[in-house]
Amino acid sequence: MINRTSLIDSKTVLDEAFSRIHAASRHEHAASLAVRHQRLDALDALLRDNMVRLCEAVSADFGHRSTHETRLLEIFPSLEGLRHTRRHLARWMKPEKRPVSLWFQPGRAEIRPQPLGCVGIINPWNYPIFLALGPLTAAFAAGNRSMLKMSELSPSTAALFAELA
């Protein structure tokens, strides 16, 4: 994760980070189900292990926001999204058969879900945990790598995400 609020060298930093992530995605074949589960499990553990720190960071960004509100509206839905994704991931990865026109018989057609490589996520300030982890969960489930840009209006949460990444 890039945690920059200055525009001075941010393009260079982003280009370097993207180059590393893109190169890694090109050298790795499509992530297996086990690898995707490992990434999702790591994200789940990160969220559970740092729940208090995340609530404190969000509260600092908002001036004060109730820990209960952050848990109820950001952390618990993120954990539920991770659980749902892990439960259905194997089915989502399977090829889907599609009908073939009579003209192309005896051919077969199917859609094979494949990762695209690197996903950029630009996160808003109002629900910084939930609105970052939802797309990040989807990117990891699809087998992609991701770059996450947190809002400059949530600096404490962005700094914590950068530390934990």
Segments predicted by a language model, with ranges:
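N-terminal Rossmann-like NAD(P)+-binding subdomain of aldehyde/semialdehyde dehydrogenases
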Residues: M1-E110
